[in-house]
């Protein structure tokens, strides 16, 4: 099979992925082999390749995988050959630690992550424990479904963590793959909420307005009225300070990032945290997040904005993603 392999860390501009031929993996007991149709390209891959979230090496990246079951490992009974499934960031959790027993498998210290600890979806085939695969709603094409598995699921988790009430003002910082899905959830499920979007790109602002943003601007602009909840999707450390400075008393900021590309600047307690302002981070996802979000996405229905690339062009997709030159979500397709 063809696969893009990361062997050394460094800037994505250097074309760190190498296209190779590899044997098709064999599913172990309880696993399924998936013929990959599409795999989303995520900011987490930038963090892995550039060393901010160092993966096992060599590794096949990619954790937003859509494909069809090709083969069942012994004892695997949840799916049938030919079923369409998705594979997300969480690949396995122990099920016995304090976090897992509390329903927080995303915090399991022994968890394995797709495309970081085990080979992912920048390849023609991938294997996964059947308990960590998900049925894909029929209404989505393969490339549309791929970003739902991370950008959508982690965005859904961030929105839940924001504790948004209908009618409050929600600020979204950055408007890429995750934010463009979250805004559609908010417009559907929180119809009285006012949405303001901060992004540097005029093309991204235009997309935000098309999807229902009430106001758009850059980090230097001031939106009308107070901001009660905010979600930071950016890789920029200073966005945390900017967002906290705009929060109303009692407001909450959710930082939807595994790593920041640059440091968070020093905060001033009175300006940024006083008046019971809160900061929460998102940390990975659970199976429950995906199992709740995918049917919700079909019901709304979410319309993912995607730009497709061939598997051979994965390095180009990563560079464009880093440069902020992709509207919506980049997706690799295998055909």
Please describe what each predicted stretch is.
Residues 237-303, 334-335:
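Glycine-rich phosphate-binding loop and adjacent beta-alpha segment
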Residues 3, 287-335:
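C-terminal hydrophobic helical "lid"/dimerization subdomain
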Residues 85, 131, 138-221:
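Mid-domain Rossmann-like dinucleotide-binding core that forms the NAD(H)/NADP(H) cofactor-binding site
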Residues 222-230:
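A short acidic, Gly/Pro-enriched loop at the edge of an enzyme's catalytic core
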Residues 25-39, 49-98, 132, 137-139:
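Glycine-rich beta-strand-centered segment in the early N-terminal region that forms part
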Residues 42, 90-134:
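Cysteine-cluster motifs in flexible loop/terminal segments that predominantly coordinate metals
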């Amino acid at each position: 099979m063809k696969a893009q392999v990361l062997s050394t860390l460094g800037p994505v501009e250097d074309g760190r992925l190498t296209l190779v031929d590899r044997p098709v993996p064999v599913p172990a007991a309880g696993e399924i082999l998936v013929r990959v149709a599409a795999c989303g390209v995520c900011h987490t891959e930038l963090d892995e390749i550039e060393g901010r979230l160092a993966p096992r090496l060599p590794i096949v990246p990619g954790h937003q995988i859509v494909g069809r079951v090709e083969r069942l490992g012994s004892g695997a009974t949840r799916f049938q050959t030919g079923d369409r499934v998705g594979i997300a960031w969480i690949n396995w959790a122990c099920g016995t630690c304090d976090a897992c027993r509390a329903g927080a498998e995303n915090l399991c210290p022994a968890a394995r992550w797709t495309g970081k600890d085990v080979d992912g979806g920048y390849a023609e085939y991938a294997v996964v424990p059947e308990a960590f695969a998900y049925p894909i709603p029929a209404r989505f094409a393969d490339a549309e479904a791929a970003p739902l598995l991370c950008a959508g699921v982690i965005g859904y988790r961030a929105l839940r963590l924001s504790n948004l009430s209908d009618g409050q003002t929600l600020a979204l910082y950055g408007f890429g793959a995750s934010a463009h899905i979250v805004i559609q959830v908010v417009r559907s499920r929180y119809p009285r909420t006012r949405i303001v979007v901060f992004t540097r790109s005029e093309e991204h602002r235009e997309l935000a307005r098309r999807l229902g943003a009430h106001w758009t601007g850059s980090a230097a602009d001031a939106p009308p009225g107070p901001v009660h909840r905010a979600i930071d999707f950016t890789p920029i450390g200073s966005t945390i300070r900017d967002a906290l400075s705009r929060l109303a008393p009692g407001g909450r900021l959710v930082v939807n990032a595994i790593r920041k590309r640059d440091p968070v600047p020093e905060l001033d307690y009175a300006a940024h945290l006083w008046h019971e302002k809160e900061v929460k981070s998102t940390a990975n996802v659970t199976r429950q997040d995906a199992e709740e979000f995918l049917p919700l996405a079909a019901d709304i229905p979410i319309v993912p904005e995607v730009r497709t690339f061939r598997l051979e062009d994965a390095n180009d997709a990563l560079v464009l993603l880093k440069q902020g030159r992709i509207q919506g979500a980049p997706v690799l397709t295998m055909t």
